[in-house]
Amino acid sequence: MTIHSEHLEEANIELAELEQQVLVACSYIKEKCSSDGDFDGKLLDNWQLPSYELAFCMAELSAAMAFSDYAQKLTTQKFTQQLALSFCAETLQSVLNRLVARATDVGLDRAKLLEMHMGVVYRKLLDTYASAGFLSSLGSEIVGNDIQRLPSLLSEEKELVRETFYRFANEVVLPLAEQIHRFDEDIPDVILQGAAELGCFGTCIPERFGGLQPD
């Protein structure tokens, strides 16, 4: 296991701990919005800001954990793992700061959250992967190696499909997209025909009815 793989595992643990705090906060709001054991949606209007903050936290955590899981499968891709660790570190900082700010509102123990903030692993991840120098090195590598995207983990067949759609998007759609959106124009035939040739229509219609979805 590489050092970056180890750090990704540590980051996952930290992310999971924050996720539990978010769930505790959600349970607190649910309790406050319940009447006679039933959830009252009208009461939730009084909790719009905390609910928004928690939704944002959960979205960030889910994205970071998904990125981490993906990167752990690519043990030979140093850059991918470094980028994932940078994203995880940024997410840890963002979510924890948001929870600390809303702790009283959502029934969390601010002292416990601050203990997490001073935790050894948390500080190590931030100091290592959220530092200005590290972010600068990632940017330099992206520019220097002309990195356009990360490994897809797709099969050879699906990678060919991805590349085909990528070329269509860049060679056919991109040159026309601004004009279409800016002036609210109809989608031209060149795009519709190309999309049809790629099988973009009828994907949810069973084959027995002339669609592309397997019966």
Model-assigned labels for residue ranges:
Residues 1-213:
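Flavin-dependent oxidoreductase catalytic core characteristic
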